[in-house]
Swiss-Prot record:
Domain Myb-like residue range list: 44-131
InterPro entries according to UniProt: Myb/SANT-like_DNA-bd_dom_prot, Myb_DNA-bind_4
Domain of life: Eukaryota
Region (Disordered) location: 139-167
Feature: compositional bias, Polar residues: 149-166
PANTHER family, alphabetized: MYB_SANT-LIKE DNA-BINDING DOMAIN-CONTAINING PROTEIN 1
Protein name: Myb/SANT-like DNA-binding domain-containing protein 1
């Protein structure tokens, strides 16, 4: 009789594919585990020392994160810097997820609290507020390149040639028109500077008003959502109470019916006993 050594494992694999897959998974060594399965593992909790180090590293690399779109390498630098500071090794993806979650938590708390009230009781709120408050200085209030203030009276007088001063002025109307033109230029330049100054002063006020209105709208939407959720919960509670009352009423009816049946049984037993005694 001819024996095939590899026939039995092949037949078992064909007849029981689940067992074959389990055996194959068991034979795969640990260093060949895919990164997708690594992501599904539960991440370690962040310690207080790691959080303080993360705040410092985030503040240090904040500008670099904002300047680059594909910032995976920046997160890897942050991970190595955090490892140097705390001795705990974290992946760049973990740091990115943690920063995203903390930013979401910060914005949620900022919308829920008033800007003039006491900050929330979250130990990292002020640190994140300081980090996210970094904005590039605006160039508002500055004159554009190439724009110069209007000519002054002293400059116009200095620009006049000595021959023009020495020659007799037999066209006084033309002279007055030139002087009026210089005065108009000077007044236009001063008025443009004043208007630019007023616009630069009005812009922060408008921004603050728009920001406060935006926050008020967010608060109103949040309060409306909370009110709607409260109404939904109250309706569910009322429905539950009605169901409980209905069940209790049915239970009372069943108890009354059982008592009536017991009384009937007792009366029947008494009649049977009386007849047997006779």
């Amino acid at each position: 009789m001819v024996r095939w050594p590899g026939l039995r494992p092949c037949l078992s694999a064909i007849l029981n594919p689940a067992g074959a897959s389990n055996m194959a998974a068991a034979e795969v060594p640990g260093y060949l585990v895919s990164p997708q399965t690594e992501k599904h593992r539960r991440a370690r909790n962040w310690t207080d020392a790691e959080m303080r180090g993360l705040m410092l590293v985030w503040e240090e690399f904040f500008d670099e994160l904002k300047q680059t779109k594909r910032n995976a390498k920046v997160y890897e630098k942050m991970a190595s810097k955090l490892f140097e500071m705390t001795g705990e090794r974290r992946l760049g993806e973990e740091i990115k997820i943690k920063i995203t979650n903390m930013t979401f938590q910060y914005r949620k708390l900022k919308c829920m609290t008033d800007s003039e009230s006491i900050p929330p009781d979250w130990p990292y709120y002020l640190a994140i507020d300081r980090i996210l408050a970094k904005v590039p200085e605006s160039c508002e209030g500055k004159l554009p390149d190439g724009q110069q203030p209007g000519p002054s009276t002293s400059q116009t007088e200095a620009s006049l040639s000595p021959s023009a001063k020495s020659t007799p002025l037999y066209l006084p109307y033309t002279q007055c028109s030139y002087e009026g033109h210089f005065e108009d230029d000077r007044s236009d330049s001063s008025s443009s500077l004043l208007s630019l100054k007023f616009r630069s002063e009005e812009r922060p006020v408008k921004k603050r008003k728009m920001r406060s209105c935006h926050l008020q709208k967010k608060k109103l939407r949040l309060l409306e959502a909370m009110l709607e959720e409260q109404r939904r919960l109250s309706r569910a509670m009322e429905e539950t109470c009605r169901e409980v009352r209905r069940v209790l009423d049915q239970q009372n009816i069943l108890q009354v019916q059982s008592l009536q049946l017991q009384e009937r049984m007792m009366s029947l037993l008494e009649k049977i006993i009386a007849k047997s005694n006779v």
